[in-house]
Amino acid sequence: MLLDNVVKQMSQEEIVNLANELTDAVEKNKFNMLCETGKLKYAHLIAMFLATQAMDDGRKLYLYFYKLAMKCGKDRIISKVNNGNKIKIAFLPISASEWQAEYIYRKLENDNRFEVEIVPVPLIGRSKEDRTAIYLQTCRFFGSDKYNVKEIYDTETEEIKGWDEIGGIPDIIVHLTPWYLNIAPSYQITKLPLNVVNIYISYSLSIGNSKTEEWESYRYNQDFLNVMWKVYTETHKDF
């Protein structure tokens, strides 16, 4: 398929519809079935996060759905482990300059319980020239040092492979940027089923706040971070 270069946010109508679908799944006792079969997506959970922001006790309501979603992903992994199957993990870098996961990648690579791959993802909302330069540089970086790399984007034709063309959606995805709307749509977190566990490794660590104390909330209380199972940062110092 051709890469869609348009950055798209959820409309208010989409947010309401997706949040209602998630609510209906729980009320009709279909959540587990729809989650296990991949019918419920992270778009549903993000919509619920956005829909509950202005509600009284909205945080409490959102956390109820969040915990259900996290359990779905963890249960899938536990089942695979109990059946003796390997856990498939994919890292999604967007740039060679933002590779903050070397340590954990090598640890997982050397553990035979895991199957690890790196999937460089092209950026959207920019010129073909800029996207091509960044993507090729990223692929060269990972291709030169014995990483298991899956290239998904043809810079000449603008064709992009989906998850099904590179071995399927993994069990765990390690995200390396929180700006998910700026990567290829088919690899955005909104497209992932709720039975996938998502981790984010930050490329920086902020230990301060603004005088109004709003910066911390602005930076960390985002939809993306609120649907992660865990958020980590690489540091050589124990804070």
Where are these regions (language model features)?
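Active-site and donor-binding regions of nucleotide-sugar-utilizing enzymes
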Residues: 9, 13, 17, 32-36, ...
